[in-house]
Amino acid sequence: VTTDYGSSIPSCDLAIICVPTPVDAELQPDLGPVKSAIDSVVGSLKIDGNLAIILESTVQPGTTRKCISESLVNSHVSREQVLMAYCPERVSPGEGGYGVQDVGRVVGSEDPILTEVISQLYQQITSGNVRAVSSIEVAEASKLVENAQRDIDIAFVNELAVLLPKLGLDVEEVLSAAATKWNFHRHKPGIGVGGHCIPIDPHYYIDIAQSNGVDSVMSPAARVRNSSMPSFSAKEVVRLCDGKAPEKILILGYSYKPNVSDSRETPVLPFINELLDNGAGEILVWDPFIDTANLPNSVNQISNPYGHEGVDCVVIATAHDEVKDLDWSNLKKTLKVPRIF
């Protein structure tokens, strides 16, 4: 393991780049980390060296070629020394069977022989199927489609969580009934969508659609719905507390998804802020996966969910296994009135 490009790249035949692709304050794609990594790799290649560069970061179609080509123009390296390929990162932290060694991969490059070689490489890493596609751009687009579709699917069930209770219907019962149909895609509603992929990648899709004169409808709508869930959920907690802001509330879970310690883009933070804006008093947060969370000053991170008297409501924000396995009879003793959201 090294952070020294200069000592490692010259001896390599292949470089895999997997860095974050965030958005800026205006929700526009920020390729800074990708460009910086590519420049560092290209800049470390010997004058007579050759290298295949595989990008794994989520990007728009055309980005791999564009960023590498631009880097080569400003370097001592000729175009003939570098081959380009793309294989999007796929992993689902916290879920068994979806690790790097399990999931299928998609490989596209500028050369059929290189595509075959890289496919064989990834097939040694994963037990999943490795799909070779016709171009870098097809592979890039596939990753955007995966995550944009998931955001849309989750937005629909979140919308159902808003609608169905108004009809006097239980959301879980309706979804479970619908799931008896063989081609129904089952998702669960929540207080929002978090992580470094699903809330971010759709903006890359929206941007490239708009840049090509396509009026994207579903992805922007999905982003609006999913981004609204922390506010909606906070208002539902107030409603559950007889229309009064809770004086004391216990939130279980802070990370963006169950069984991980990653709190990037967690919807729990805007949910907490919405509670505070709605006049909530003391807020306690318990998450067995996170030692220190970047919480507002008025929020207390606790190491034990039990023994806190006078709690108005318990919120299951992130359903860790440890949360599900809590002694709910004991936890109930902390509540003034049995209220669990």
Language-model features, listed with the residues they occupy:
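Structural/interface elements that position substrates and couple domains in central-metabolism enzymes
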Residues: 1-341
